[in-house]
Amino acid sequence: MALMLVLLFLAAVLPPSLLQDTTDEWDRDLENLSTTKLSVQEEIINKHNQLRRTVSPSGSDLLRVEWDHDAYVNAQKWANRCIYNHSPLQHRTTTLKCGENLFMANYPASWSSVIQDWYDESLDFVFGFGPKKVGVKVGHYTQVVWNSTFLVACGVAECPDQPLKYFYVCHYCPGGNYVGRLYSPYTEGEPCDSCPGNCEDGLCTNSCEYEDNYSNCGDLKKMVSCDDPLLKEGCRASCFCEDKIH
């Protein structure tokens, strides 16, 4: 069975009374949000890792994330197009297929607040069961804390023709939100229980550079060994990353 992704976006709006006489200041703020700046990259990565290590319930197999240049190029290209919808998969693929979170606002929100807004969907989420109410979005949260994601990068653009003219795009590699375990984005347990000897400040460091193309690779591997060329090609993470998080 091929893996299927669930994608969502989020928006934030300030009232008109707070939008007056701020254009020049906001242009400067937008420059300070540029993810070409090392300090901004560090803010984004540190915020993600801080949130990943403080999930509730605690997780045993969440990887530490790092910045990825190729993912940044893809995220910034999509932000620059100002198309307020998710990019096609081929536009967010590096050596891995990447997930995507989107955020739109009528003001230049800080990266930390954008990522926090995604994470705050956890308030409407019950681990293992899903949203507390019908129609509530939780997919941004589950992507932020997806266990096997270990590369992250983001881009931002000003889109003057859009009602919400600030467009934020983050790519997560490999992507999460797979149908089948959408509401279990990580394994519940004590931090790093799944990665003994490969732990840094509560997050695992034994990432896998490959990914599986099928959701049942674990079962297939038990039935047919990785000596089978088709299994080896379609289930590369299961075959080559036995002691790594994937």
Curated annotation (Swiss-Prot):
Expression sites by tissue: Secreted by the epididymal epithelium and then becomes associated with the sperm surface.
Any Gene Ontology CC annotation: specific granule
Cysteine disulfide partners in this protein: 192-199, 195-204, 208-241, 217-235, 226-239
Glycan-modified residues: 32, 147, 213
Major localization listed first in the record, in broad terms: secreted
Residues in ShKT domain copies: 208-241
Stated role: This protein is supposed to help spermatozoa undergo functional maturation while they move from the testis to the ductus deferens.
Entry protein name: Cysteine-rich secretory protein 1
Gene designation per UniProt: Crisp1
